[in-house]
Each structure stands twice: as C-alpha cells, then as structure tokens.
Amino acid sequence: MLFKGIRLAVLLSGMLIFSPMTPAQIVLKHPGWEWRISETGCAEQLIFKNKQRNDTVPFFRKGDHAGPSFYAKREGKEIRAPWIPDGYASYRSEIDGVLCCISYTKVHWQPALRVKLTNESSVPFQPQKAGLKLGIDTYMDKYPDWFGKYFPTLMRNEKTHFYGYLQTPSGHTLGLVSQQPVASWSVDYNLGYQDPAPFWFMGHRIESLNLDLLNALPLPSRHPQDLYELKQGESKEWTFLFINVGKLDNLEYAITQAADIPLIDIRQTSYAAHEEASFMLTADTPEVKVTNDAGAELPVVLTKAEGKRWIGKVKLEDAGLYTLSVRSGNKVAEAVWTVHHPWQWVMKKARENVARYHQKPTSHAESWYGFYSAFLAARYFPDKTLDKQLSDYFDQLYNKLHDPEKVEPLYFKTRIQNTSTTIGMLADKYEAQGNLEDLKKASKLADWMIRTSQRDDGAYYNHGTVYTSVIYIAKSVLELAVLERKQGEQDPFWKDCAERHFLSAKKAIDQLVASQGDFQTEGELTFEDGMISCSALQIGMMGVLEKDAETRKYYTDAMLKILNSHDCLTQLRVPDGRRRQGTMRYWEAQYDVQMLPNMFNSPHGWSGWRAYATYYAYLLTGDEKWLEQTFNAMGAFANLIDYKTGQLRWAFVVDPHLEVKQACSADTKLNFSDLSFGNPHPKLYDTRKFVIGEQYVNMISDWQTVNTQDNDVHELFKCIGETVLTNAFVIERPNGEVVGYNCRVSGKGNTLTVKADEKQIVNLHCNLKQPFSVTFGGKSRSLPKGYCDWAFGQSGY
C-alpha cells in the first residue's frame, strides 16, 4: 500500500522499481531504463541508461498528441478518451462501449506496454481505426531541437506480429515490437496553409504515430485481415516492447533478442536478371519459399548458421518481383526482391514516358523535369524521331519561359531552382546533341543567377532564405562547369566561364559546410529530406571534384556527418526492394498528383538526391555499404516503370491504409502547352474518394492540363544516368572475395577479367586491397595494392 507523501522503492537484482514522485506521477525504474508517467496516465519520457550517455525518448506532454492514449476514428471523426487510474501504472478508458486497459511494465528486461480491448457493448465494434496514439514526440520544427526527435522510419505489419523502429537525426534507434498481430499503423500529418480559403494544403511535420490495433479493410495482403472488428463480448490483447537498439546496425539482433518472431534481413534488395540473391534469417525452424509474381516457386538453399540464424540463397529469374515467405512455428514473415530490366531498357522507357506524360511550362521546374530523361537517353540510345520531337518541344517550352535576348527567366525569377534545373537540362542537351548554343544559354543563365541570387557568404538565396539545397543549385552549376572545362582546353573563353562558375558553386557549398546542419529550405521548416540530402550530395560532389587529399577529406567528413543524420528519413531496413532506399517524403502528393491528405511517398523523385550522395560517398570512402545502398536505390527507382507494361508510375505510397481524395477532372481553361502558374488545389476540381495503401500511384500529366509536378519522378532516371548507366564497380572484400556491380568478374591468381553487363557500360571503378592485373573492354592494367579509383574510363566528373 502506498501512503501519501511517502516514497516506496523495492530494489532486487534485475527487478523493476516503482517510485511515485508525487501522488499522481509515477516513475518505473530498471537498471537499464526509467519510464516517467504523468498524472494523466500518458508517458512523459523514457530514458535509456548507457555507460557513455543516456538516451531520452521524449513524449508529447499535453494536447491531442500526448500518449499513449486510446483513440478511435469513425465516420471521419476521431475520438480520444482520457485515462482513469486502474491499479498501479495501469489505466483504462472507454469509447463506444469498448474498454481499453493499459499497463506500463517490463517484459524480457525491456520497457513494455500491455494493452487490452474489450467490447462491452451490444453490437460489433467496426471503426475506421482504433488503437493507440503512441505519443512519442515526432514534431521536428527547429534546429537543433530536431536532432533529439524521433522519426517513424519503419513500421512493419506481418500477419502474425509487428515490428519497426523510430530514429533520431543524431542516430539513436528505438525499436518497437509486438508478438501479436496489429492491423495497421498511421501517422497524423499537420495542416499547412489555406490557398485559396477554405481549402487547406498539408504541412511538413508529423504530429503523432498511431498503432492501429483495429483497422477497416482493405489492407495490404501481408497484414492481418481479420482485425477490422471486435465482436460483442470479445477481447484482444497486445504487448508492445520498446527496445533500446542504439545504432541502426543493431536492429535485427536487438529485436530477436527480445521477441520470438522470424526476422528477415536482406542487405541487397535489387538484382539484375538471373543473379543469385541471398538473405539472413533469424528463426527457430523455418519453412522458406520464394515465388515469382506468377506464383511459381524457385529452389532455395537454406544453411544453418550460428544460433537461430540461417543463410539462404536463391537464383532469381527475369525482371519482376520475387516474394520470400517464411513460416516458423505459428509466425510468418515476408520480403520482396526486385529484379530490374537492363538499364538501357529503363532509360528508353523513361524517354517514352516523357512524351506520354506532358512536360508543361509552369512556375515549377518539376513539371518539365522529364527532359533530363529525354536528353540522357538521346545521348546513349539515339532515336531520331522521338529525340527530335522532344528536343523541339523543349525549345518551345524554353522560349515561353525565358527572354531570348537577355537569357533570363520571364517569370518567378526568385524561384532559382527553376533556373538551375534549366541549366542542368541544357548541359545534358548539349552532351546529347553537341550544339554549343545550348551550352552558351546554360552559361548565361548561370551568370544571371549568380549575379542576382548569390550572397557574399556564397549562399544562393530567394528573398532572404538560403536556397542552395532547394533541389541542388550548386550541383547544377558544377555540372555546367565540368563541361565548360572541357571546352576550355581549346578556348580561353570557356576556361574563364568554367573557373567563374566553379568558384561560385564552391562558395555556396562552403557556406553549407559552415552551416553545421542549420540549413534552410523552401516551405515550412522541418528536418527536411531534401534540405539534408541535397546539402550532403553537393558537398560530396565537391569532394569528388577536388584532387587535393586534405581538401577531399574535409568535404568527405562534412558530407558523411550530414548523410548519417539523414538515415532516420530513409528506408534502410525495410525488407522490400520496391521501397528500399526510398526517402520518407510526405507532402508532395497534393502538388504532384492532386491527392490529399499527406502520405509517405517512398521512393519519390526526390529520393534520388540521397542516392547521388551515397554514390559520392562510395567514391570518396570505398566503403561498400554506400555502393550497396546506391544499387538498392537504383533498383527501386527502376521499378517505378512497370516492368510488364513500361508505364511510368509517380511514386510508391508506404502508408498501409489511406482514405484519399484526388482530383479527377482536367482544367478546361488551359492546354498542356499553355503557361500555368501556382499550385491549383485539388478541391478546385471534381474529386473522388477511395482507399490506397502500400502501392504505386499513377501519373496524372497525361490528362491534367494545369501545373502538376508528377514529372519530378524523372530525377530518378537522371540519377541512374549519372551513377550506374555507364559504370561498373569491382570490390575486393576484407575476406578476399572479389565481387562486381554491373559486371561479371572472373579471376585466377592476381589476374581479374571483368565483363560489363551492358554494352554502354564503359567505365570501371576498382576498389582492391591486393595488387591485380585487370582486363576490361579488351584493355588491361596493373593496379597496385590499395587501389580505389577509376581504372578504365571516368565517372563523368
């Protein structure tokens, strides 16, 4: 019995300590952690105690997002019920005759939450959603506070259980697992602004992570399909463990130590046709099968490793999706590999889709982003008729948006990302066609932008806001400078241009480095995917271009610090090749495909920004993890083109159950080639309601005439063109194994023969610990011990 004003603590080895700080506040203590619970029954903070430092998981302390709290959604409205004390560290609440009981406790030495739902009403309970608003503080609104906030990076529902993790930009990972099936999950996205009133656009922040214990159908087939209701008198129970994972590399080990669930670990999620895929599995007695999308099984070799770990191998077939299914006892798990078509096929199909989905002259460069794909494909795989059609239309669009004499934008001049994007397109057009007039236009546009929009400290800006990392202003200028340097070998005019533009970009990138993570971006400030990834990639590109070892290391270190902080926004562990390496953007659908509300679009066109950065990280460090991440990303990107039909999709939506509204009627006042400015709200048009979840979303620029930005998906094919389309990589691993990416490697002794997977792959990068003689493309070179650089050809920079 606890008496008012008296603290009671019982300490036994490994036991939980209950310590009331006030009559209403409770602190649950354990040698490794401490959980503080407020007088409302919601958590205040969860502190994990480590030898070097403590890691604190903050919870919202007041308002609608405090939690854990019981909530239900029905008829489009959410109800949140307050807790009533129901025993020590236990609480209850009720909605519509459904009783929810929770207890804060310990399971397997981990802080845990036991949850029980009981339908005490006289009718079935069939909400749209019902469960817990978890309450962990996910609201990233200012620097440097956001380094301690938790982003909901991965939530994974299997038919028999649930797991996932949240991660901070500073690198701490919080695992979450339940051995009971959970219907679904969702997040609450904030509202942004009205334009025009009364219509709302969504914001750039996340207010809550919700564990939806019950959820209406449809749900993805991998989810439990029977948790859409609670019958009269029925009860269901769940236990959620909160696991101090620490570094993300510990995720699978930490989860399997605390929960008896089969866990699939696939480090490479994308392959070329007929390659052998491997996976690691933690399970007791697994039954494993791999099927293609027609349901045919492929032979799997499963080998027992240490403890409960198993290593599996399977030879995949033609382009498509391959599902790995695991059963261990009464638990099941699933993973997906992608096998991509040759990169040549991908780029040709991307170009075809540039013509299918209209490129539109608007206030936003995203609406004509497809010209990147058009000019890259034209450079490597000429198609006289289609290339002329697209080139002529680009010229028409360019002339509508620019003053031909002054060579500067006619509209929205402060949206300098439009200008830098046009510079990049003109550079690619020049490389495809060899017309020096395109390079001259790009050079003059760069001069205009630098003159009007670069501060003394180097930052490119828009009305006082640093815009260097809105898309990637400096990278586009560097792409131009690289081409000007080549021309400058014969012409001093171009040499001067190259030097001027290179120094401008360098100043801008040095300002990013000096910002120490305190970056700025377009729109509502948050720890924003593109702001972080574009800063990392531009610093990385500068490092690649630098020849001085000390300067190169300076940029490398700065880039890696930023790139590592971006991990929390990236799907680095999801066992699904369609999504792997996608970045977790969530406010683009309203602008790109006129769909509301917010949703995780991953991969989305802007996922390409991180992939440039991981590519540069590999070139600068030789660490294979960055190359693996790059190729996983390219596989996910390639799969946005339907491998059966060649049709381009806009993005993959991660949320498992979303009730959306999408515009379904075209604007009748404008044609595709007419100027269109601003972001027309979806509700200005006829809309339809429907449910989506874990699926691709189609493009709309084939029918919507006004400004939409779904063509930003072409950033992914630009990224493919710059990183893997013409490049192969050979790596000697620490154990002496030599592997190839985009190539096949055979060897005898200290001799390696490398055969490219495709004929346009003419550059070979070698990362070797021992000296080797390497043959590639009919040529041979002797490479010294520790060689890590381009051995044949060059990267393009």
Walk through the language-model features, giving the residues of each.
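Short, solvent-exposed loop/linker segments at the N-terminal edge
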Residues: 267-275, 363-364
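Glycan-recognition and catalytic cores of secretory/periplasmic carbohydrate-active enzymes
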Residues: 311-317, 323, 332-771, 777-780, ...
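Beta-strand-rich N-terminal accessory domains
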Residues: 23-193, 234, 239, 744-756, ...
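Bacterial N-terminal signal peptides that target proteins for export
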Residues: 1-10
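Trp/Gly-enriched beta-strand surface patches
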Residues: 147-229, 295-299, 771-774, 781-784, ...
